[in-house]
Amino acid sequence: MKKQGLIAVDLDGTLIDTVAVNAESYRRALESFGFTLDYDYYAAYCNGRHYRAFLQPLMGGNPSAEDVERVHDLKKQYYAANMDIARKNEALFVILEALRPTHYLAVITTGSRQNATEMLDHFHCTDWFDLILTQGDVVNNKPDPEGYL
């Protein structure tokens, strides 16, 4: 059967609620560098933003680019251990499962390919998607629309 169109969804906060997963992973990573992170602060000011934009203020305002990357790399290591606290959007999963035979499916995220794939694998839906677009696949991350174009 020929597919009729494309459905593109965001991963974090749309397909899967990953706020707690990311907050805990960043909290642990930052803690190992001597910094603290509160869940409410993360949810209000960091969630959905690219890590380079929000880690600098959390790391004293002027950390080296290398230290920012070290924190992010450590966060990616903690991510898998925290996936059990993620919650899938049950209604959206039902819709996508019903439409996948007739539509191409894409998931778009500002997250890393590693974390996106781990999360989709955790919910047994990686193979649903014809395209997984991550931060490494675009020049301009969300909120720029590049990933959707």
Locate each region found by the language model:
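Active-site neighborhood of HAD-like aspartate-dependent phosphohydrolases
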Residues: 1-44
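Short, acidic loop-to-helix structural element flanking the phosphoryl-transfer center
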Residues: 3, 80-107, 113, 117
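Short alpha-helical
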Residues: 21, 50, 114-115
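Hydrophobic packing residues within well-ordered alpha-helices of enzyme cores
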Residues: 26, 55, 92, 116-120, ...
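Helix-loop "lid/cap" segments that line or gate small-molecule binding pockets
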Residues: 29-30, 50-64, 119
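Structured helix-beta-strand junction loops
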Residues: 49, 101-102, 135
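Metal-dependent phosphoesterase signature
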Residues: 58-94
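Substrate-recognition "cap/lid" segment bordering the active-site pocket of phosphatases
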Residues: 85, 112-149
